[in-house]
Amino acid sequence: MKNILFATSEAVPFIKTGGLADVAGSLPKYFDKRYFDIRVILPKYACMKQEWKDKMNYITHFYMDLGYKNCYVGIMHMEYEGIQFYFIDNEYYFSGPKPYDGGTWDLEKFAFFSKAVLSVLPVIGFRPDIIHCHDWQRSEE
C-alpha cells in the first residue's frame, strides 16, 4: 500500500477559487483504495461555509516555531466521499475573507502552512510515501 498526501491550499467542495480546487478535491477518489491510502490536507479558512466547519472533528493542537513566532496549529478532520481530509486551523493566518490576499502576506501564510503540514504528519500517524504539493502555495515545502 502506498501512502499519498495531497497538500493543497484549496479543494472542492470545501473552498474553491479556481481549477486547483477541482483537481485537489476530485482526483483522490479515483485512486484504487486497495493500493493507495490517499489523504488531503488544506487550511481551515474562516471563509469556508459553516456547514463544512460544523462537520469537522477536532483532533488536537500543538505549537510550532515559525521564525520568531510560536504558532498555534489546530488539526481538524473529516471523511468525505471515502477520503480523509485534514484541516490546519490557525486564526492568525486563515481568518481573512478569502483564501488569498495577494502580496507578501500570502508568502508568510503558506510558509506557515507548509511547515505545519510536515509537523502534523507524526501527530496524525500518517507516513506518506509521496507528498503531492499542489500549486505555488505548496512550493515552500
What are these regions (language model features)?
Residues 1-141:
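Catalytic cores of nucleotide-sugar-dependent glycosyltransferases that transfer UDP/GDP/TDP-activated
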